[in-house]
Design a protein with these regions (language model features):
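Short, well-ordered secondary-structure "scaffold" segments embedded in the functional core
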Residues: 1-185
Length: 185
């Protein structure tokens, strides 16, 4: 059933929270020089593709980016290009890779950890806040780990890139199936 109003979302998912993160997967090095540069991730020091996931408190995948992005792109750029639309009262938990999201999306209830300023240590309350934030956000990391347990998503992707999104959709569906059926027991 498709939920059409904010009230319906609140009825079916009381206290709904969203946890958003991106993940990279290594691919074979492209032959084309231009594509080589586009897919090279400076963070991983490899050629990669990125996929963004949004999960709920139980770890169920609610949204996956429709198309993979080139590994060179930053997490926040991936979010700006293709982001899930959530009701205004839903809390969205991000990591520091999405720093600045409050300025670009003022209606979004974005919750980010406190960023350390140069040469200034975080206070104890800020450190405690960051610890609580990471404890809540770890669910998205666990879900990504479940996805990567499937060999096709955890190892280097050796298939054609035009099939990547179909494969990640299939694996996401299997992970959701396993999560949903383990919750009901």
């Amino acid at each position: 059933r498709r939920l059409r109003t904010v009230e319906e979302v609140e009825i079916y998912f009381p206290g709904f929270q969203a946890f958003i993160d991106s993940t990279e997967q290594e691919i074979q090095r492209p032959k084309n020089k231009k594509r080589k540069k586009e897919y090279y991730s400076g963070k991983k020091k490899r050629h990669t593709v990125k996929t963004q996931y949004m999960v709920n408190k139980e770890g169920t995948i609610l949204h996956k980016s429709n198309q993979h992005k080139k590994g060179r792109q930053h997490d926040y750029t991936v979010y700006k290009d293709e982001h899930p639309i959530t009701p205004p009262q839903v809390k969205n938990y991000f990591d520091l890779g999405y720093y600045g999201i409050e300025n670009d999306f003022p209606d979004l209830k974005a919750i980010l950890p406190v960023k350390k300023k140069r040469n200034i240590e975080l206070t104890k309350t800020e450190k405690r806040y960051n610890k609580r934030h990471s404890r809540q956000r770890v669910i998205v990391e666990h879900t990504i780990c479940r996805i990567k347990k499937f060999g096709i998503m955890g190892n280097r992707y050796r298939n054609r890139l035009k099939r990547y999104d179909v494969m990640s959709d299939i694996v996401s569906g299997l992970v959701n199936y396993k999560i949903i059926h383990s919750i009901r027991r």
